[in-house]
Amino acid sequence: MHTWRFRRPFREPAINRTDRMRDHFSIDHKRTPRRRLSVKAILALDQGTTSSRAILFAHDGSIIGVSQKEFTQHYPKPGWVEHDATEIWTTQLAVARDVLKQHDMDVSDIEAIGITNQRETTLVWDRATGEPIHNAIVWQDRRTASDCDALRNAGHSDCVQKKTGLIIDAYFCATKLRWILDNVAGARERAENGELAFGTIDSWLFWNLTGGKLHATDVTNASRTMLWNIHTGQWDDELLALFKVPKEVLPSVHPSSHIYGETESSLFGKSIPLGGAAGDQQSALFGQNCTQPGMAKNTYGTGCFMLMNIGEEAAASPSRLLTTVACWDGGKREYAYEGSIFIAGAIVQWLRDGLGIIQSSSEVESLAASVDDTDGVYLVPAFAGLGAPHWDAYARGILVGLTRGTTKAHIARAALEGIAFQVADVLDAMRKDSGVAIEELRVDGGAAANDLLMQFQADIIGARVVRPKVIETTAAGAAYVAGLATGFWKDSADIERIWETDRVFEPQMPAEEVARRRRRWAAALERSKQWVEQEASAD
């Protein structure tokens, strides 16, 4: 048992003189401004894994302004990843104030706040004081992997998957929450007495934005806890018993687009309606306007997350994709298939930091474009195992097909193509399980700006790849659900009209060549699988 001690979190961030001079985080609402921007807007709070961001959206969907502030990552032990929840709150409030200050916005012109957040990150705090009893355990944290192994070995996988659409994994909240209750002195007893509150990061922001009046979450975040039944739309008593979680700690669950309450007036000078929330990937699906069954989006970040709208039935995936909740507006329920790829943009960072063949990430496209193809080189970026649809924790990255003629340009191109091949594998699984052809893939994230990658992606999946003008789709989704709740936008058709295309990449590669390359990729992929076990047996 560990006793964790935290200083009492600030309700407002401490601001030093340097911050005031550099970032202007403090807003004086009593002064008479020289100029004030007179436009109605939605404020999206985008709380991510490495930074807190605030983005202002106008009614036409354009971005008025952005503010961002990074926060500290904590790695107390190998495989453990934590965040200071107080720092998350203070940075999020700071950037919200900053973006209003930058653009001289009148708070009364902010129609609503929408929240999107890193999913699965788990936090418990004291209801009376608002103090976290432990650092937030981040979605990347693997400390409960052995607990998950034990649950799978005990035969609980089918029950959990049928109820939640998820596989038993340390990625999700349930075992993280149980770990906190079992390892913080007195936590379990206090939880059972109703003294503690559990939440994902959206819940933590709601709590602080309302001065502790609101303990709530939305359906998309609830669906990632491994405690919420996606069919009944309720916390599941059998799952709560399995993971030893007392019901007293749980937040209320609401549709993504919903008036949750309003902010404390002291935070921004006036109260602002809290119009919605959604986990980051579901928010991006909505931000990409994928509101009809069969529509899919892929986010290219450190990894890739592909979601496909599958409509009103929470169909199980024979290919072991996740079945998750899409944004709900209080009317019909919608679901999505999700496929996670662990390493995507991170492979470019490895080319830079690990191999040193590029000086900056932006160089990879021009280097890769300097050769016509990879000259038979394939790179399987299984540095952290393989995600969907392979789910092989023992796979490792491999680089095959090397000759004396191989250059760094061939390796750079193979790295980009390795991202696209992984996406194609997930898309194939979605096509197979849904029976939908999927003729268009909407894309966002940093690597979506890489034209070479996007063209190869279109070629290898045999479908259009569509890049939107506004690539801040995660924040846009949060803005949309909040704006729909308050009537800022009338309906989803209103939002569809403002969604605009930047560029469409049409498949150009002959089908025979696509088939040949995918056969070679599949051969390379097989060689990467179960590598750790093979290495162990060889020793």
Curated annotation (Swiss-Prot):
Top-tier EC class: transferase
One Gene Ontology CC term in the entry: cytosol
KW Kinase (keyword) present: yes
Xref: SUPFAM superfamilies: Actin-like ATPase domain
One Pfam short name: FGGY_C
CDD domains noted in UniProt: FGGY_EcGK_like
Catalytic activity line of the entry: glycerol + ATP = sn-glycerol 3-phosphate + ADP + H(+)
Notes on activation and inhibition: Inhibited by fructose 1,6-bisphosphate (FBP).
GO BP, sorted A to Z: glycerol catabolic process; glycerol metabolic process; glycerol-3-phosphate metabolic process
Superkingdom of the source species: Bacteria
Pathway(s) per entry: Polyol metabolism; glycerol degradation via glycerol kinase pathway; sn-glycerol 3-phosphate from glycerol: step 1/1
Keywords: ATP-binding, Glycerol metabolism, Kinase, Nucleotide-binding, Transferase
Gene Ontology MF term list: ATP binding; glycerol kinase activity
Binding site for ADP: T49, R53, T302, G345, G446, N450
Binding-site residues, ATP: T49, T50, S51, T302, G345, Q349, G446
Membrane spanning stretches: none
Gene3D superfamilies: 3.30.420.40
UniProt-listed Enzyme Commission number(s): 2.7.1.30
Residues that, per the record, bind glycerol: R119, E120, Y171, D280, Q281
Family that this chain belongs to: Belongs to the FGGY kinase family.
Function: Key enzyme in the regulation of glycerol uptake and metabolism. Catalyzes the phosphorylation of glycerol to yield sn-glycerol 3-phosphate.
This protein's name: Glycerol kinase
Organism phylogeny: Bacteria, Pseudomonadati, Planctomycetota, Planctomycetia, Pirellulales
